[in-house]
Every structure is written in C-alpha cells, then in structure tokens.
From Swiss-Prot:
One of its GO terms (biological process) is phosphoenolpyruvate-dependent sugar phosphotransferase system. It is found in: Cell membrane. The phosphoenolpyruvate-dependent sugar phosphotransferase system (sugar PTS), a major carbohydrate active transport system, catalyzes the phosphorylation of incoming sugar substrates concomitantly with their translocation across the cell membrane. This system is involved in fructose transport. This is PTS system fructose-specific EIIABC component. It comes from Mycoplasma genitalium (strain ATCC 33530 / DSM 19775 / NCTC 10195 / G37) (Mycoplasmoides genitalium). The gene is fruA. InterPro entries: Bacterial_PTS_Sugar_Transport, PTrfase/Anion_transptr, PTS_EIIA_type-2_dom, PTS_EIIB-like_sf, PTS_EIIB_2, PTS_EIIB_2/3, PTS_EIIC, PTS_EIIC_2. The active site is at 68 (tele-phosphohistidine intermediate), 174 (phosphocysteine intermediate). CDD domains: PTS_IIA_fru, PTS_IIB_fructose. It comes from the Bacteria. One of its GO terms (cellular component) is plasma membrane.
C-alpha cells in the first residue's frame, strides 16, 4: 500500500514559514530530512533535488508539487509531506503550491515511489479529494482522507470483453521517466473513465515498459496518442493511420483537446515503419514509386541531398582555400594561376577541385535517391553532371546563341541539380507505374537491371538536356545578382539577411538555405565571396555569445550547464552553430532574440567591411583565407591582414551584443522574481 511510505515524523506543517523560492525550500527540507535520519547527506540531497527541478518542474497538479529524490544520500524509501503557504514552484499552471510530497528513493530500487506516484495520481485526479487534501494539517488527517477515498474507488477500466476496439491507446514517456510519465497516464485514463471510453495506456518510465501495448491493441484502436518528451521506438505504430504526437504536459493539462484530435481523425500514419534517425534511413523510407505526398517528400529529399553534398563542399572548399594560402607569395603576379604555382598548392588545388566538381552531381543524385531509392542514383548523377557543364550544349549568354553540340562552358549549377534530381525521380515513378508495369513476369527481372537504367536514363538525360537551357539562364541571373549585391551599398543588406537566416534555426532548413547560398556564391564566382564570409562569421556568433555570457555572469546558467557553455568557445570558433542548440531549446525567447540580433549585426558588418572568404567551413582555423576589398587597401597580404582584423571586430561586437541580451534578460527575470516574492 503506497500510504505505508508516509509516517508521522515526516509530516511538516510549515504554513507559517516563508521561502525565497522553491530552492530555498528544498534546502531547508533536506536539512529536516537529515535530522529525521532518512538521508545521510543534506547537501548531496539538495543538489539532486535542485538538478531534478531544473530539468522540468515537478509542480504538475494545481497547488501541489511532487519533487523526487533518487540519490546515494537516501537511507530508506520515504514520502515526506510539507504544508506550505503559497510557495512559487514555477508549476505548469503557474499557480502557487500549498502542499508538497517529497519522495525519496534508493538508487537501485524504484518500484515503491512509482507505485506511490501512480496511486496518488489517481486520487489527485478526483476533484473532491484534490480540494480536500490541500486543507489537511496533520498526518492523521491525511491518512483518514486517503482511506476514505480508497474505499470509494471503482475500477478504472470496463471489462475487456465488453468491447473489442479501443477508443484510443497511448504511450507516455518523459525524460526522467518518473512523474510526468505516470501523471500523463492517469490524466488520460481519468478522462477516458469520465467519458466512458475504452483505453489502454503504456508507460515507459524508469521501471521499464509497463502495461505494454500489443500489436493487436495498436492495430484495433481508433487512434494512438504518443505523449512522449523523448525518443521511443515508433515502428510499432505504423499500421495505425490515426497517430497523434503530443507532450506529456499537453496530455496532463488538456486530455480533452488531445482526444478531440483522435476523435476527429486528425492524426497521421507514421512514415514507413519508423521515424528515420539518419539520412540513409530517410532515403530508404521515402523510396516509394508513387506520387503520394510528393510535395512533402520533395522538401525532405532536398535536405537529404544537401546533407550528402556538404562533405564534398567542406573537403574540396578547404583544400582549394589552403592552396591559395600556400601560394600566397605568388598572389600579386600569378594572374589566373594563383593557387597552382607552388607544387604543393597545385596538388591540393587539383584534389579540392575534383571534390568541388562533384557537389552538383551528388546533390542531384541524392535528391533522386531520397525519393525513389537506388534507381534514382544513375539518372540523378547524369543530369547532375549535365547541370555542372560537363556535357555538350553551349550558350553565348550575351546574345543567346545556342551551340547544341559544342562542349559546354556554362552550367545551371544548383538550380539544375535540384530540378534534375526531381525530374529523375518523377520519370522513375512513371516508368515503374505506367510504362513497365504490365511487362510479363519473365521480363520483370531485367526491368531494373537493363530497361530502366539504360532507356530510362537516356530519356531523362535527353529531356533534361533541353530543359536545362532556361536553368542555365536562371543560374546566370544569380551570378549577376551576386555581383550587384556585392556592391558597397547593398553588401551590408545582403550580409544582414544572411546573418538573420544563419542564426534563426541553427542547423535547420533556414540556416541550411543561407549556408548553401554562400556555397553557391563560391562556385558561381570562383573566388571568395561576401555571402560565404557573412554565413561563416554570423554562424559563429550564437555559441560565442553564450560562452561570453557564461564567463561574465555564471548565474545566467545552471551549474550543470556551465561546462557546455564554456565549450561553446571552441564550438563557435570552429563554426559549429549547433553548440548553441541546447540553450536555445531551454530558453527559446531570450536565446533566439540574442542570436538574431547579434547574427544580423555580424552579417551587416561583414558586408560593410567587404569581407570575403574562399573556404566554405573551418571558422577561425581558415581566417588566413579572409580578405577585404575595401577601397584603398591594395595587395594580397594587406587585404588578408586587414580582413582578419575586421573579422575579429565583427565577432567581438556581435558577441558583446548577444551576451548583453542574455545577461540583461537574466537580470530582469531575477529582479521580477524577487519583486514577486516580496509581494507574496
């Protein structure tokens, strides 16, 4: 019985005490528990309780909190009850707490506290019990109240035989696998009982999977609710076509809204048996020979192609940039051969050139691969090579003369790669579904070995050979646009926009679009560009701002966050924007504001200083490849030296702005918290 964890000596009526905040309460609670000999180290216990609260609040029911302690400091399992007066617990509903159940558990034994949470949750979801328990002032009063409502409990579920189909099944899982996991379960079951619904809820907590759903449960349910705050195995739910994904908090606070989604068939069928965890799985899962949800698959296919392309960009771009660095002594008199005079520089330049020449074919091929799997690779590569200008058909862009069989000296670049990859996939689908579908069984074996690779690729290449003409002009227009935007007047605006995009979603589609634009500018202009410099410098700003804020004011971050915050120095200097993601997730408003403002400033300054770089990646380690083309600064050495100095100025100013916003927000938030505590 879960009430056996309660005891008279662990009921504390502290309604006359005042606490600065919940951490002040936890400190005093740890001291009181050590005096009662249920823990042996109040400091260790306090740190464990504090860490748990910093992960996610345990104030999950109106006016009640369930902090839990799982630590080596616990001598024996216990539940301590604290009666307090309107303590701000930063609860989910933002209401003050009046009653606290502090649960202590041995490190290697979790069943007792899970039993308490599960059973007590059922009582708290009874509105009458929830209102009365907040008024108890003694251990005896609490026990009598629990006994009274335990006697009145009825079965939560109707008999299995009464219905064969569940109204919904659900899985609940939170990061720690304790309170939210079970509260979400109880909230869903209480809602189901109230509305006479037949349900089954599986929990995936610290005690493993309980009440596990079978394949029959899932397949025969009207819908599936995945109330999960962490990744679980989704492959079991593919057969159900009405799957809803929500947080445990949503399931706890608004189970009615969640059920309405199930009831109105607003769910979806999960993509091919599992959520893909990497790009290879994405490509395999999306390799369908049909046009179902094709518009949605296009977006994911392009991102997949970009991810395959990026290693070629980084490798080739950095090697080419290093060749210029090694050949720096010949910069002023090498003319068009700069980067190839020195033998080592020439070797690196040629090797980097091979890698760089493959980025368009790789992009095209893997866009097709992501849509139709392996059959898209051959036509995708071929049209990608045509896009990069490695075939016949030349256009004199100034007068529009087309030389059909002349070696190509123009390219459609990334425009051709994207369109060509999509065209290849579409034609594969058409061939599979309409052209070769009625072949006799004896010929099906050679369809994928001979017919589609040979005739399909020939047709795709011939069609794209013609379609590529307007794409060449589109790419030419982009080159003209970049030349215009590199002017002293418009360059700051270009940098401003790229800086905003780079810092918006840190590795997401908008960030990738800005970065790819910088890479495109490198390829189109065959030289260092402002776009690439703006993308790299502004992408370094978010992690560097966080690191500087942590160095100036440690209290902006939790103790556990500080090592990661300091590590952002290295992440930022290496141009790894993703180092800032954990901090953005935890404090999205302040971090996103700081990132956008600081990144936009950095990008605008990059344009104003006419900074350019030849390398697509590397951060501070490729700063020697920076240069400025500001008027009056002549000579490669001087342009590089001044360029490095101005790049550091851009970073320092942006870091100061970003860290100031983070620190300022922290000061304001803590001032408001102190003011609120005084008023209460």
């Amino acid at each position: 019985m879960f009430k056996n964890l309660l005891r008279p000596s662990l009921f504390f009526n502290w309604s006359q005490k005042t606490f600065k905040n919940k951490f002040s309460f936890l400190k005093q609670a740890a001291n009181a528990l050590q005096k009662q000999a249920v823990i042996n180290d109040n400091n260790v216990a306090f740190e464990a309780l504090k860490k748990r609260e910093e992960e996610i609040t345990t104030g999950i029911i109106t006016s009640l909190a369930l902090p839990h302690l799982q630590s080596q400091s616990v001598i024996e399992p216990f539940v301590a009850v604290f009666k307090v007066k309107n303590l701000d617990w930063q609860s989910l509903d933002q209401k003050p707490v009046k009653l606290i159940f502090l649960i202590g558990v041995l490190v290697d034994k979790t069943n007792l506290h899970l039993d308490f949470i599960s059973n007590f949750s059922k009582l708290m979801l009874n509105e009458t019990f929830a209102s009365k328990v907040l008024n108890v002032t003694s251990y005896n009063g609490l026990i009598k109240l629990i006994d009274l409502f335990n006697q009145q409990k009825v079965q939560d579920q109707p008999a299995v035989e009464t219905k064969k189909e569940y109204d919904f099944v659900a899985v609940t899982a939170c990061p720690t696998g304790i309170a939210h996991t079970f509260m979400a379960k109880e909230a869903l079951e209480a809602f189901a009982k109230k509305h006479n619904l037949y349900v089954k809820v599986e929990t995936q907590g610290t005690d493993g999977i309980q009440n596990q759903l079978t394949s029959d449960d899932i397949n025969n349910a009207k819908g599936v609710i995945l109330a999960c705050d962490r990744l679980i195995d989704f492959s079991r739910f593919y057969a159900n076509k009405n799957v809803i994904e929500v947080s445990t908090t949503k399931a706890i606070k608004k189970p009615d809204e969640v059920y309405e989604l199930i009831k109105n068939q607003k769910g979806k069928q999960l993509a091919n048996s599992a959520k893909p965890t990497n790009q290879t799985q994405l490509a395999e899962s999306e390799g369908e020979f049909n046009f179902n949800n094709f518009h949605k698959r296009i977006y994911r296919a392009i991102l997949s192609g970009v991810s395959y392309m990026l290693p070629f960009v980084v490798f080739g771009g950095i090697l080419i940039a290093l060749s210029f660095l090694i050949d720096i002594n010949n910069a002023n008199n090498a003319g068009g051969n700069f980067g190839t005079i020195n033998p080592v520089a020439n070797w690196l330049n040629k090797l980097g050139g091979i890698s760089f020449s493959l980025i368009v074919p790789i992009l095209s091929a893997y866009i097709a691969y992501a849509l139709v799997s392996r059959q898209g690779l051959l036509p995708g590569f071929v049209v990608g090579l045509i896009s990069s200008g490695q075939f016949l058909l030349n256009i004199v862009l100034t007068n529009g003369t087309i030389e059909w069989l002349a070696p190509s000296q123009v390219s459609s670049g990334f425009f051709g790669a994207i369109f060509g990859g999509l065209l290849s996939a579409c034609l594969i689908i058409v061939q599979q579904n309409y052209i070769y579908k009625k072949l006799p069984q004896s010929l099906q074996g050679i369809k994928n070995i001979l017919f589609i690779p040979l005739f399909g690729t020939l047709f795709t290449a011939g069609l794209f050979w013609v379609i590529n003409i307007p794409l060449i002009y589109l790419n030419y227009g982009l080159s003209l646009f970049l030349n215009i935007m590199n002017s002293p007047i418009l360059a700051p605006l270009l940098g401003f926009v790229i800086g905003l995009m780079m810092c918006f979603d840190l590795g997401g589609p908008i960030n990738k679009a800005a970065y790819v634009f910088g890479v495109v500018s490198l390829q189109n202009q065959n030289a260092g560009t402002i776009s690439m410099a703006a993308a790299m410098l502004s992408g370094m700003v978010p992690p560097l701002s966080i690191a500087l804020a942590a160095s100036i004011r440690k209290s902006c971050f939790d103790k556990q966050e500080l090592p990661a915050a300091y590590a952002c120095y290295l992440m930022g200097l290496s141009f790894i924007s993703e180092g800032a993601i954990p901090f953005v997730v935890k404090k999205p408003k302040v971090m996103l504001t700081a990132n956008l403002i600081a990144g936009a400033i950095c990008g605008a300054l990059t344009g104003a200083f006419a900074l350019s770089i030849r390398a697509p990646h590397g951060g501070v380690f490729v700063f020697a490849l920076l240069k400025t083309t500001l008027q009056g600064i002549e000579g490669a050495t001087l342009q590089t030296g001044v360029g490095i100095g101005l790049a550091l100025v851009c970073l320092i100013i942006s870091m100061i702005v970003g860290s100031s916003i983070i620190i300022g927000y922290d000061l304001i938030a803590k001032h408001n918290q102190r003011k609120q505590n005084l008023n209460s």
